[in-house]
């Protein structure tokens, strides 16, 4: 079996192009499995995985848990809100106590940038980063690449624009790294206040005009405004944001071109996307959710082979 070059999935930046190709190829095989009447395989039988989430999650947590069960792994779920973290226990103490129960792998989401990288220096178990602050969300980028490949036949040479709150998005950074490693052209589009100053150093195009960005791209990956991470006001109102940066059917129809619409969720309908776009034939948003299970199965399976 081919192996990944890494023991942990901490970020896309750490992966080689071959790593990404291996994950997506393996995910394709697992997608066939989960569409069968019997959806489980014994690949991770006797492997115990802890989902350690310090931030709220719906799609990512459910997707990881389902991926683990499809692989026949034993799964335990940790919620910070109901734990000794509330009593002052440190992150490392919390995780070491979980590992003392003979857990083999940690899937972690944390509000602090670099939290999984810190753990990787102190523990022996495999770690999967399910999102660290505004830094990276590697499995989201991998499932996005898988979905583009499935829809358009490949990623290389495609023009992908990431729209919205780039400044506070961990999805944006992971996608930029993943897309570039696979030969795609990448652009970001949003208000100047929500585009980080360093973004040009990553070799991506920057556009502030929504219509021009849509005319350029084959794929629009649309991000929500992350109000929970904003400490100052970056634009006057959500209504004004929607007026200048919201994608609606009328706008798409006027472009007279096919654009694939993606969104990592949750969608703020009527803000970054209108319902008639989110639910249209342009959208592969629910395909992304479906593909997330297969991609996370691939990540867990391949990491389990890299002790």
From Swiss-Prot:
EC numbers: 2.1.3.2
Enzyme class: transferase
Record-listed L-aspartate binding positions: 87, 170, 224
UniProt-annotated binding residues for carbamoyl phosphate: 59-60, 109, 137, 140, 265-266
Pathway(s) served: Pyrimidine metabolism; UMP biosynthesis via de novo pathway; (S)-dihydroorotate from bicarbonate: step 2/3
InterPro entries: Asp/Orn_carbamoyltranf_P-bd, Asp/Orn_carbamoylTrfase, Asp/Orn_carbamoylTrfase_sf, Asp_carbamoyltransf, Asp_carbamoyltransf_Asp/Orn-bd
Transferase found in the keyword field: yes
GO biological processes: 'de novo' pyrimidine nucleobase biosynthetic process; 'de novo' UMP biosynthetic process; amino acid metabolic process
Superkingdom, taxonomy of origin: Bacteria
Alphabetical keyword list: Pyrimidine biosynthesis, Transferase
Molecular-function GO term, any one: amino acid binding
Enzymatic reactions: carbamoyl phosphate + L-aspartate = N-carbamoyl-L-aspartate + phosphate + H(+)
HAMAP family, alphabetized: Asp_carb_tr
Family: Belongs to the aspartate/ornithine carbamoyltransferase superfamily. ATCase family.
Assembly with partners or alone: Heterododecamer (2C3:3R2) of six catalytic PyrB chains organized as two trimers (C3), and six regulatory PyrI chains organized as three dimers (R2).
Task of the protein: Catalyzes the condensation of carbamoyl phosphate and aspartate to form carbamoyl aspartate and inorganic phosphate, the committed step in the de novo pyrimidine nucleotide biosynthesis pathway.
Protein's UniProt name: Aspartate carbamoyltransferase catalytic subunit
Biological source species: Cytophaga hutchinsonii (strain ATCC 33406 / DSM 1761 / CIP 103989 / NBRC 15051 / NCIMB 9469 / D465)
High-level lineage: Bacteria, Pseudomonadati, Bacteroidota, Cytophagia, Cytophagales
């Amino acid at each position: 079996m081919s192996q990944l070059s890494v023991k942990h999935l901490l970020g896309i930046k750490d992966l080689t192009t071959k790593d990404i190709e291996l994950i997506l190829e393996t995910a394709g095989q697992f997608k066939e499995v989960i569409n069968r009447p019997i959806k489980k395989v014994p690949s991770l039988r006797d492997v115990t995985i802890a989902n350690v989430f310090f931030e709220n999650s719906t799609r990512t947590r459910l997707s990881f848990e389902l991926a683990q069960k499809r692989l026949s792994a034993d799964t335990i779920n940790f919620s910070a809100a109901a734990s000794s973290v509330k009593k002052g226990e440190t992150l490392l103490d919390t995780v070491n106590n979980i590992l003392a129960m003979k857990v083999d792998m940690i899937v972690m989401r944390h509000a602090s940038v670099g939290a999984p990288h810190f753990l990787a220096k102190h523990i022996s178990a495999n770690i999967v980063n399910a999102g660290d602050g505004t830094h990276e969300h590697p499995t989201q980028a991998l499932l996005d690449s898988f979905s583009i490949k499935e829809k358009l036949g490949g990623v290389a040479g495609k023009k992908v624009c990431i729209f919205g709150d780039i400044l506070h998005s961990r999805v944006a950074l992971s996608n930029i790294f993943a897309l570039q490693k696979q030969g795609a052209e990448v652009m970001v589009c949003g208000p100047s206040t929500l585009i980080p100053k360093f973004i040009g150093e990553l070799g991506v195009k920057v556009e502030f005009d929504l219509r021009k960005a849509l005319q350029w791209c084959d794929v629009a990956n649309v991000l929500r405004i992350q109000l929970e991470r904003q400490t100052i006001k970056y634009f006057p109102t959500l209504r004004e944001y929607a007026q200048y940066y919201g994608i609606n059917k009328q706008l798409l129809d006027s472009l007279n071109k096919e654009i694939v619409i993606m969104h990592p969720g949750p969608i703020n309908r009527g803000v970054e996307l209108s319902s008639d776009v989110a639910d249209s034939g342009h959208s592969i948003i629910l395909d992304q959710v479906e593909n997330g299970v297969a991609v996370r199965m691939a990540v867990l399976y391949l990491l389990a082979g890299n002790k």
